[in-house]
Amino acid sequence: MGNRRAPCCDKSQVKRGPWSDEESERLRSFILKNGHQNWRSLPKLAGLMRCGKSCRLRWINYLRPGLKRGNFTKEEEDTIIHLHQAYGNKWSKIASNFPGRTDNEIKNVWNTHLKKRLVKRSISSSSSDVTNHSVSSTSSSSSSISSVLQDVIIKSERPNQEEEFGEILVEQMACGFEVDAPQSLECLFDDSQVPPPISKPDSLQTHGKSSDHEFWSRLIEPGFDDYNEWLIFLDNQTC
């Protein structure tokens, strides 16, 4: 078997349980007069039926001068929470930042008070996050439903709007192409002014010379090959 540290005292010959006021005063008086160089031998020298470890803890946590009693302030509690996040359960290291406070006292206030507060705060924060997410989801769903309904209304109204626009466009086109013109050409001419239709006579009436008859016959039924020949013919007739 490996080397084991010998117990500080015979447990069968030591007293257990709470310290009495008489025991506490005897320990205080001895340490203030002689100091505490060796905790193993101190109980026997002080006349106490306690083990060395119990004497040391009683002195450090309750009897030594300069201990700060009473409840922790709000600033002390916040500092303990901050240091616990950095050091964990290293109570002696945390207690070194609190003059007059013991590591045992800090451990007790953490386990009985501060840890429960953090648990409640975490639960409250989680519930708030869930509520906010639910409200946000509900608001988003309502917004989506409203948007869909608006699109449906717009689409249902759009055919009627297109039909009305088509009717207006047809009316505007009809007005644009309307011409302020007389319904009949009779208003442009009197009956005496309208020329009679021209038709080819069945027989030619002869008036004057035979050359005139020849001229008009060729004019009505031209037989010239080209325009120049026709002009020459006209010149000959006028000479």
Swiss-Prot record:
Q: Which GO terms describe its molecular function?
A: DNA binding; DNA-binding transcription factor activity
At which residues is the DNA-binding region annotated?
39-63, 91-114
> What is the tissue specificity?
Expressed in cauline leaves and siliques.
Q: Does the keyword Heme apply?
A: no
Q: Tell me which residues make up the HTH myb-type domain.
A: 11-63, 64-118
> Which cell locations does it reside in?
Nucleus
Q: What is this protein called?
A: Transcription factor MYB10
The record lists the organism as Arabidopsis thaliana (Mouse-ear cress)
